[in-house]
Amino acid sequence: MSHFSCIARDSQSAARAGVLATDHGEVLTPIFMPVGTVGSVKGVYHRDLLSDIKAQIILGNTYHLYLRPGLDTLRKAGGLHKFEHWDRPILTDSGGFQVFSLAPIRKLTEEGCKFSSHIDGSKHIFTPENNVDTQRIIGADIIMALDECCPGDADYRYAAKSLKLTQGWLERFAAHFDQTEPLYGYSQTMFPIIQGCVYPDLREKAVEHALKLDNENRGGYAVGGLAVGEPTEKMYEMLEVTCPLLPQDKPRYLMGVGTPANILEGIARGIDMFDCVMPTRNGRNGMLFTWDGVMNMRNAKWTDDFGPLDPLGTSFVDSYYTRAYIHLLFIAKEMFAAMVATEHNLAFYLDLVRVAREHIVAGDFLPWKNAVVPKLMQRL
């Protein structure tokens, strides 16, 4: 069973600092969670995730792990923690977003989500019940309820229909979760996902419905269906609608977000947990996030820059390698370039939430955030 305690609140915003306790260790919030979709954070050794990046919790994805390596392998391995040799907390998404974004053929009904594999075209179905069973076999500490990720530009009628489907699935998912047990000797908790697209009344209805199902097995609440095509200001507006309605004694997780500025703005609105592929995916393409802004390491301006990769960075790679050297590696399409950039970006994202936490505790988060955000968005 997970437990969340809030240790500090910002007096000028909804930001808060907390501790999320799981059987695989504590997570200090606000936190960023590196995405390890198929049991691996792309381009990073676990050694570096632990000692350099200082990741406290990572993600896995049910859709990908269900398809490959498959549930038989994961069960024989004793779950994902043992399979990938990671003894800190893991969170798994239900796979709903991946069905929405990857599956070439999909059909959503009250029964569940029928889809074809993007790997070999084979046919599958996720129901709320078998999705619980699948995530029990994977064995993450925190599991997400099955939902439909509604497109950001959906009209009200579609969004309302989508929410009704998600609510029906949530009722069955929560009931089956409560009737089943973890498989590997440690506890698991589940987060309902609050949907509703960009419509405040739908978000409010989603929270009201989810809270009717609240009990000790609901370790927190996720806010989904944002950063999927809607304007950024709409995302912030939906957080302002949703977060105040959620329990104060449970963590809030904003799924799939986002840029460093998005994360700080999310913290200011009461979010505790974040994940995003941006630091890894953009890093592989030469984009580095820093306190001074965003660097494109493919740009010729770095050709003769022999200064450290990031003088303000805390990662090993930041002081060990020069900008000129990493620029060369990207131009030469060396695999190592992507590894260095990924390590830097993930370390920066973890630094970002760590420093944000320090300012929440110190009581000056909002002025600090307001001063930092414009710099984070600059192009260097």
Predicted regions and their residues:
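Glycine-rich phosphate/ribose-binding loops and adjacent secondary-structure elements
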Residues: 164, 176, 180, 185-309
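A non-catalytic, amphipathic alpha-helix used as a structural packing/dimerization or gating element
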Residues: 130, 134, 161, 165-172, ...
